[in-house]
Amino acid sequence: DGLIPYIQTIGLYRSKAKNVLETCRLILEHHGGEVPRDRDALQALPGVGRKTANVVLNTAFGEPTIAVDTHVFRVGNRTGLGKGKTPLAVELALLKNIPDEFKVDAHHWLILHGRYTCQARKPRCYDCVLADLCDFRHKTPPPGEASATPALRRKPKATGAV
């Protein structure tokens, strides 16, 4: 209960609080109080999947991992750097295509690029440093220009009146 006030603004905070406390207990009991540096050991902790394990390995230990969140998934697929239908497929494609010297930082660059430039609804292709490499740029015109594809037209709502 002591942890909940600090995390109650995030979704599923009760189960996350339970997982955090259990994870701390397991790290103390099974890992001598040290966060494991192994993906399998991390994923054995409650609430830790591949994405979270990759974040820990990358940020805490400087490992060349790519945690595929919604932004990385979108940027990877739009640019062709990491095409795939699943986060794992995108991760593996990105690891194959990104030069070794950039792998540690690429995860953060891709997240920021997806958050601020290659946005889901209104991508800023006209302002993108990767536009010349990206197939998606033709789908998003600069502000003020007509859309490359016609906007969907909404059907009027039925009122029930005859």
Language-model segments: residues:
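Catalytic cores of DNA base-excision repair glycosylases
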Residues: D1-A148, L152-K155
